[in-house]
Amino acid sequence: MGRTVVVLGGGISGLAASYHLSRAPCPPKVVLVEGSERLGGWIRSVRGPNGAIFELGPRGIRPAGALGARTLLLVSELGLDSEVLPVRGDHPAAQNRFLYVGGALHALPTGLRGLLRPSPPFSKPLFWAGLRELTKPRGKEPDETVHSFAQRRLGPEVASLAMDSLCRGVFAGNSRELSIRSCFPSLFQAEQTHRSVLLGLLLGAGRTPQPDSALIRQALAERWSQWSLRGGLEMLPQALETHLTSRGVSVLRGQPVCGLSLQAEGRWKVSLRDSSLEADHVISAIPASVLSELLPAEAAPLARALSAITAVSVAVVNLQYQGAHLPVQGFGHLVPSSEDPGVLGIVYDSVAFPEQDGSPPGLRVTVMLGGSWLQTLEASGCVLSQELFQQRAQEAAAAQLGLKELPSHCLVHLHKNCIPQYTLGHWQKLESARQFLAAHRLPLTLAGASYEGVAVNDCIESGRQAAVSVLGTEPNG
């Protein structure tokens, strides 16, 4: 009888792990267990009354690098090439990004000319920050906060405006708490290897071999900055589910895991609400803190390391306006914490993907709310109503983009604990977990956003790596 692998969590990481397991030459029996009634995790697309697409989670995927190429290969393998909506390199959504500082939108400088001239909100040309960076000595600490790293290498303005905003946009987090080593490993490694971040990024870390396909070649030739799918990004997990079913993977929905226990013969017993499963190996693609509460007593040191990986909530407010126009064209803008503690940024969805505007077309923007404002609200225990978030989002759209009319359509979703926080020393938590798993030879593999990347590409790759680890070899078609 063959091995049984149980995958916990039907988000994109668990789906990717199941996909690669199912494509092995001699695949194990795969059981995917999801606590909710739907697959896809935070990737969710909703169609509005006029046919417009609203993304409640991620809204675009970057094609860059080996990870971006692997995701495009997955898209092709699933037969979704014709559904891809690219943002090409010459498009405003690829070229223009903004910061909202001092009550005004400021375009982030691009190209050499942009770096050589003063660009508000920065008081001096960013060229000088780059020059300063080249002369700075290498840091001596094994880890550092993003703010400390950026201030030391690039100066206080870049740290408090650009990097603060970036941490809010990517992690909905605080740059004074997040780890440079874990959140931006390429910057950390560039300094370690080349003493200078800029030098390291210019010289690169050596070419990583990446897959090849017609879609990957097209993305490179047209310099795509991101892409989506015609019916929304949820088409990707939906296609994965269809594929898994065709490959004989058992998909259990609405089955939250209640506990994990080790049997005498070294197999897992996975306890569900009304039943249980036996597994030779478990891949956990659920949040680290959730897994920590399911582990048996003999794995207490592992549970302690995992429970220390926390996550923050984000309120996503999708707004659509009829007959409205944006003051600028671009991907969107970020807001530093010094400007507004609650508004993380606004994405101009209609600029990047006008094909999803519906009929009649309406201007779509998404306001992200979070940060210390939301954390304080959550801690206070007061009711977090949809009206509260809608009002806050409409006020931000009015003040920051001049969208003063009432939206024709609005969706509000509070995603509780949706983005893991790689705080200072995160790498040590991962090391503790790895050492425990290796020392005790536990048939458990960790995957998902809690560990080494929160972007969709990172999650898909973590699922693939988990499958490779279980199979002991690269799966093939």
Swiss-Prot record:
Lineage: superkingdom: Eukaryota
Chain's gene name: PPOX
NCBIfam families reported for this sequence: proto_IX_ox (TIGR00562)
EC number: 1.3.3.4
Single GO BP term: heme biosynthetic process
Needed co-factor(s): FAD
GO cellular component, one term: mitochondrial membrane
Known partners and oligomeric status: Monomer. Homodimer.
Cofactor note: Binds 1 FAD per subunit.
A Pfam family reported for this protein in Swiss-Prot or TrEMBL: Amino_oxidase
Keywords: FAD, Flavoprotein, Heme biosynthesis, Membrane, Mitochondrion, Mitochondrion inner membrane, Oxidoreductase, Porphyrin biosynthesis
Subcellular location: Mitochondrion inner membrane
Reactions this protein catalyses: protoporphyrinogen IX + 3 O2 = protoporphyrin IX + 3 H2O2
Residues the record lists as binding FAD: 9-14, 42, 57-60, 257, 449, 454-456
Family: Belongs to the protoporphyrinogen/coproporphyrinogen oxidase family. Protoporphyrinogen oxidase subfamily.
Function: Catalyzes the 6-electron oxidation of protoporphyrinogen-IX to form protoporphyrin-IX.
Protein name: Protoporphyrinogen oxidase
Pathway: Porphyrin-containing compound metabolism; protoporphyrin-IX biosynthesis; protoporphyrin-IX from protoporphyrinogen-IX: step 1/1
Primary site of residence: mitochondrion
